[in-house]
Amino acid sequence: MLRVAFSTTDGVHVDEHFGRCLRFDIYDVSADGHRPVRTRVITTPDEPGDESGRLDARIDAVRDCAIVHLAAIGGGAAARVTNARIHPVKVPETTAIASLLERLRSVLAGTPPPWLRRHLDTPTTSPAGSPR
């Protein structure tokens, strides 16, 4: 089982920049299918000039995910996401979440690349403190 996040404004498409995203839809994906887990909404207001705090809130929202799909991400933010052991995947804006879920399910049903297999073998802690 793999937990993945999607930066979205409508719950249907990946259409948001990571640093501005206020909503992440979270799914569990396996070779057999996928299921929605929850929608996480960023509720803390962004303070002007506090890029670190803004990124911390978003990283915390997806901390239990192995992958976060997004429309855009800056270099510094990508490094911080990667350091949190989350793999950022940039996709064209308005890519359908359903197609990404099916593509990931298909990869998991075959022979996933080594970086993805490591995520399958390594449980992490969710924002609520429980394993993913």
Predicted regions and their residues:
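Mid-chain, well-packed structural core segment of small domains
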Residues: 59-91
